[in-house]
Amino acid sequence: MIETLDSPANDSDFLDYITALENCTDEQISFKMQYLPVIYSIIFLVGFPGNTVAISIYVFKMRPWKSSTIIMLNLALTDLLYLTSLPFLIHYYASGENWIFGDFMCKFIRFGFHFNLYSSILFLTCFSLFRYIVIIHPMSCFSIQKTRWAVVACAGVWVISLVAVMPMTFLITSTTRTNRSACLDLTSSDDLTTIKWYNLILTATTFCLPLLIVTLCYTTIISTLTHGPRTHSCFKQKARRLTILLLLVFYVCFLPFHILRVIRIESRLLSISCSIESHIHEAYIVSRPLAALNTFGNLLLYVVVSNNFQQAFCSAVRCKAIGDLEQAKKDSCSNNP
């Protein structure tokens, strides 16, 4: 029978229970050592140079800047900031969860992961709303496409993400376990009741609401284009690719992480068997790099969003043949009704 630990209980029993759970999850250290450093290394080796190139193209090659350009540039910046934290996590998990960089860096790296995660989610939501207005309400798009609106939206995203994630600097803790210094993530820190309610509010406001908005935006866009005059145009094909890519990022990368984070925190508050707790923690570990894989999806997004980006990339790497092919495709699309 499952018994909640939220109600007042004997303090020594509670501490004994938490210690037992820590012993359960300690069994995952070898799994983390084999899984997380490898996946994080792949993400870093692909994502860091990819986002560096993307930022360079947006800054030096893309002219004139449009609303989508500004949003994509900010998205690439937040991805790059996140990727710079990965070497610290790679070292941490490869060394058997032995944190050598101090308490400040522990909080900073954990804060950086969540700050850039939610910045990325909100930038993708802003981009989806801009696309929705341009396609569904074209008469309003002339004002909304002015770059000042994108600048305001991006500034708002940075501020909202900062405010939303700031409490983590107080909730995330580092500790010493079995002769090693551990940098705990949100789900493993100590103030469980506060963490539970903070996590629920954070998930509802900065993930569930954006997920609903993005889903409604793209289902409406596809429905409108399907029954509209441009049914067979390249415009619709591009919209379909964007829809599939954005929804994959949200439902494959972000959704499992948020669901399993809620379950992981709840499992620490409920009196459950060590075996179940171990399996929940293992599933949560698997979901964490999934959330980071959105950086791969974002790299594809830069290419899909703009033909100008494709041409600028080809110009940067001197791939003239591919550039000619993309120009031919663009001309073909523009000639379609």
Swiss-Prot record:
It is found in: Cell membrane. Pfam families: 7tm_1. Residues 59-69, 138-151, 222-242, 306-337 are cytoplasmic. Highly expressed in mast cells and is found predominantly in the tissues of the respiratory tract and kidneys. Residues 1-37, 91-116, 173-200, 264-284 are extracellular. Glycans are attached at residue 23. Disulfide bonds join 106-183. InterPro entries: GPCR_Rhodpsn, GPCR_Rhodpsn_7TM. Its main location: membrane. One of its GO terms (cellular component) is plasma membrane. Belongs to the G-protein coupled receptor 1 family. PANTHER family: 2-OXOGLUTARATE RECEPTOR 1, PURINOCEPTOR-RELATED G-PROTEIN COUPLED RECEPTOR. This is 2-oxoglutarate receptor 1.
